[in-house]
UniProtKB/Swiss-Prot annotation:
UniProt name for this protein: Nephronectin
Pfam family, one: EGF_CA
Organism of provenance: Homo sapiens (Human)
Gene it is expressed from: NPNT
Higher taxonomy: Eukaryota, Metazoa, Chordata, Craniata, Vertebrata
Signal sequence extent: 1-19
InterPro entries for this protein: ConA-like_dom_sf, EGF-like_Ca-bd_dom, EGF-like_dom, EGF-type_Asp/Asn_hydroxyl_site, EGF_Ca-bd_CS, EGF_dom, Growth_fac_rcpt_cys_sf, MAM_dom
Length: 565
């Protein structure tokens, strides 16, 4: 009876405990499959990711190169490798106890054992005494093949020397046996080789693999530009460019002094063809257009001829001969005295002086002494002034004079020189933005200093384009031209940048184009043909494209480009 009562009591307590259990999971699940409870749901723990079949797998960033991921950012390396991401070779020969009995040579991901002279390597890796190998005296041991002794080398990068006993290195880089990825150079080592990034590049883990990435020396401060220059990063290196108002190679920049030449006063031009030169003393020199004026072939000095009347009167000088060809600017004048000519006479060629013909009404009787001697050594000051076109020992050859020749105009006469250059810091330099396009080229401040052009963002759906045109004008018949420019087409869906040339009112297919990249790049293109009317840069963007198209440092030179890139 007592036993039955005890059994009933135990049964009631069990049923009460079972009724209180609601079947819910605990707050945290300690499991080897990476499951955790987050409030009322169960999901993969932090550092784990759910696979397509529903199981949670650990995630390692970066990935394990020679191993497997066993936990969040935790790699288990394969034999022969070490490191956090299993990307380093394990030197088994340095382990204790040593894996080899005699000689050990480490290889990438493994190792090899070799026996001393007089021993042979057995199949189990041990070394056994061999009188035959001892007699051969091999550097790295020997092997018996069909009863013959043959010395062996431990690596494919080693080969037997002519003596048949020692091993010499094989230069895989020179023989072409090496195979290095792009942008890496081969460096030979004893028994092997390594692939190393070129100068200006650094090995980085990008996109799930190791790549040679360009080093931005400008942003890192690893450049040697002048303090008056800007640093521009290019692929594998950098370049220095002097700032506005300075000149030089970028490593050394020298200030360019500003020179301004202003006229001393207003110049009155009388009726008729001719030119008036006004000096500092206020005396006007009227130079008529007379085709019969001659200048002696070699007259180093013109002797002064002074009239009896000292009052100020205009004097005449030879007729200028205009020419469209630009020349260097004028030299500082030396004292020269000319005399007011007599009424018109028949022109003759004197031996020691100058004879001119001018209208009688322009010069009254009498004359004055005017210091108009010209220095024979030509100089080249800048500015829009009257300058000699052909400087020589003959002073001015028949007074061939033109106005408005600058250093830029003079450079256009010489082949292979710069004929146009623009960095857009102070405007478009002759480039024209076509207004009928959907988009426009706009100047934007460069963080490194100055400005560059960029294509505005598209605001309507469909294809959009912005065109920048440079009319060549007189350069249209200059032959081949070298177009050089810096550009960048960066970002997600950045668009397209293209180069065209227009001939006979229309342009053909694009000569060059780019729709992606990283950072600024330098490009040179040879524009072939003598009938090019204009050069066109076309930038295309669509709505929603977040990338940037940039253009800067555009220049044109005569002739072919030294390097197409």
């Amino acid at each position: 009876m007592d036993f039955l009562l005890a059994l009933v009591l135990v049964s009631s307590l069990y049923l009460q405990a079972a009724a209180e259990f609601d079947g819910r999971w605990p707050r945290q699940i300690v499991s080897s499959i990476g499951l955790c409870r987050y409030g009322g749901r169960i999901d993969c723990c932090w550092g784990w990711a759910r696979q397509s079949w529903g199981q949670c797998q650990p995630v390692c960033q970066p990935r394990c190169k020679h191993g497997e991921c066993i936990g969040p950012n935790k790699c288990k390396c394969h034999p022969g490798y070490a490191g956090k991401t299993c990307n380093q070779d394990l030197n088994e020969c340095g382990l204790k106890p040593r894996p080899c009995k005699h000689r050990c040579m480490n290889t990438y991901g493994s190792y090899k054992c070799y026996c001393l002279n007089g021993y042979m390597l057995m199949p189990d890796g041990s070394c056994s005494s061999a009188l035959t190998c001892s007699m051969a005296n091999c550097q790295y041991g020997c092997d018996v093949v069909k009863g013959q002794i043959r010395c062996q080398c431990p690596s494919p990068g080693l080969q037997l020397a002519p003596d048949g006993r020692t091993c010499v290195d094989v230069d895989e880089c020179a023989t072409g046996r090496a195979s290095c990825p792009r942008f890496r150079q081969c460096v030979n080592t004893f028994g092997s080789y390594i692939c190393k990034c070129h100068k200006g590049f650094d090995l980085m883990y990008i996109g799930g693999k190791y790549q040679c990435h360009d080093i931005d020396e400008c942003s890192l401060g690893q450049y040697q530009c002048s303090s008056f220059a800007r640093c521009y990063n290019i692929r594998g290196s950098y370049k220095c460019k002097c700032k506005e108002g300075y000149q030089g190679d970028g490593l050394t920049c020298v200030y360019i002094p500003k020179v301004m030449i202003e006229p001393s006063g207003p110049i009155h031009v009388p009726k008729g063809n001719g030119t008036i030169l006004k000096g500092d003393t206020g005396n006007n020199n009227w130079i008529p257009d007379v085709g019969s004026t001659w200048w002696p072939p070699k007259t180093p000095y013109i002797p002064p001829i002074i009239t009896n009347r000292p009052t100020s009167k205009p004097t005449t000088r030879p007729t200028p001969k205009p020419t469209p060809i630009p020349t260097p600017p004028p030299p500082p004048p030396l004292p020269t005295e000319l005399r007011t000519p007599l009424p018109p006479t028949t022109p003759e060629r004197p031996t020691t002086g100058l004879t001119t013909i001018a209208p009688a009404a322009s010069t009254p009787p009498g004359g004055i002494t005017v210091d108009n001697r010209v220095q024979t050594d030509p100089q080249k000051p800048r500015g829009d002034v009257f300058i000699p076109r052909q400087p020589s020992n003959d002073l001015f050859e028949i007074f061939e004079i033109e106005r408005g020749v600058s250093a830029d105009d003079e450079a256009k006469d010489d082949p292979g020189v710069l004929v146009h250059s623009c960095n857009f810091d102070h405007g478009l330099c002759g480039w024209i933005r076509e207004k009928d396009n959907d988009l426009h080229w706009e100047p934007i401040r460069d963080p490194a200093g100055g400005q560059y052009l960029t294509v505005s963002a598209a605001k309507a759906p469909g294809g959009k384009a912005a065109r920048l045109v440079l009319p060549l004008g007189r350069l249209m018949h200059s032959g081949d031209l070298c177009l050089s420019f810096r550009h960048k087409v960066t970002g997600l869906h950045s668009g397209t940048l293209q180069v065209f040339v227009r001939k006979h009112g229309a342009h053909g297919a694009a000569l060059w184009g780019r729709n992606g990249g990283h950072g600024w790049r330098q490009t040179q293109i040879t524009l072939r043909g003598a009938d090019i009317k204009s050069v066109v840069f076309k930038g295309e963007k669509r709505r929603g494209h977040t990338g940037e198209i940039g253009l800067d440092d555009v220049s044109l030179k005569k002739g072919h480009c030294s390097e197409e890139r």
